[in-house]
């Protein structure tokens, strides 16, 4: 096997501080130190390894982790779903153009509903009912997604029209 790096899921849970659902995303210096220690240990063994975090915490905390060389997920699901459905509200992609070059943007994931499915449920006019129109809109979405600078996470071909809900037959559709 050739391992390029490691992805850590739900890293806001990597803490020794007590927290609740509402406070887990607050700035936590101890969590930063734990993740920096893991990062250093990985780099000691393989200096070119990627370390990717599903973090979703305070922006100051994410900035510190990025400055240490780690990459962080950047959830753009809502914006891409809004454009896929033909809606302008909340459809800006500017979250991927922030000053932190360590963002790994994504349109969909195992935690987020698929854009093509949302088109069939809440799409504007023909986007809801016409497959050809939906696919053309998803092509435009993919064009924006793939041309934004930086790395991308692609998950189960949502950009190609996977229109089954993630809730069908359990969490993975």
Give the role of each language-model region.
Residues 1-7:
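An active-site-proximal structural segment forming one wall of the substrate-binding cleft
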Residues 10-112, 120-124, 133-136, 143-147, ...:
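Active-site-proximal helices and loops of the catalytic beta/alpha 8
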């Amino acid at each position: 096997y050739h391992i390029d790096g490691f992805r850590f899921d739900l890293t806001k849970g990597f803490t020794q501080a007590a927290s609740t659902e509402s406070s887990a995303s607050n700035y936590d210096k101890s969590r930063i130190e734990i993740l920096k220690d893991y990062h250093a240990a990985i780099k000691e063994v393989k200096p070119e390894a990627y370390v990717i975090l599903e973090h979703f915490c305070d922006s100051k905390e994410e900035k510190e982790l990025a400055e240490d060389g780690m990459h962080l997920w950047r959830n753009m699901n809502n914006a891409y779903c809004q454009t896929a459905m033909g809606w302008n509200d909340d459809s800006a992609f500017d979250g991927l153009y922030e000053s932190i070059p360590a963002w790994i943007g994504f349109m969909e994931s195992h935690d987020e509903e698929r854009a093509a499915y949302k088109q069939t449920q809440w799409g504007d006019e023909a986007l809801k009912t016409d497959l050809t129109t939906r696919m053309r809109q998803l092509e435009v979405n993919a064009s924006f997604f793939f041309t934004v600078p930086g790395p991308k996470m692609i998950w189960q071909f949502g950009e190609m029209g996977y229109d089954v809900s993630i809730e069908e037959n359990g969490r993975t559709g």
